């Protein structure tokens, strides 16, 4: 039996902010990332848990 990945709880967006800019984040469901447009970074969501470490973030294209 295969397990489906844990879903991200969108209510977390009310409490989470970008660790760089302290601005709100946008949820990209397709990529499973939280996006900070100000910092131009996308933070991964793994097993339903956002990884809010700058070293783990993906730089966004301009």
UniProtKB/Swiss-Prot annotation:
One of its GO terms (cellular component) is cytosol. It comes from the Bacteria. The lineage of its organism: Bacteria, Pseudomonadati, Pseudomonadota, Alphaproteobacteria, Rhodobacterales. Transmembrane segments: none annotated. HAMAP family: UPF0434. It comes from Ruegeria pomeroyi (strain ATCC 700808 / DSM 15171 / DSS-3) (Silicibacter pomeroyi). InterPro entries: Trm112-like. This is UPF0434 protein SPO3421. Belongs to the UPF0434 family.
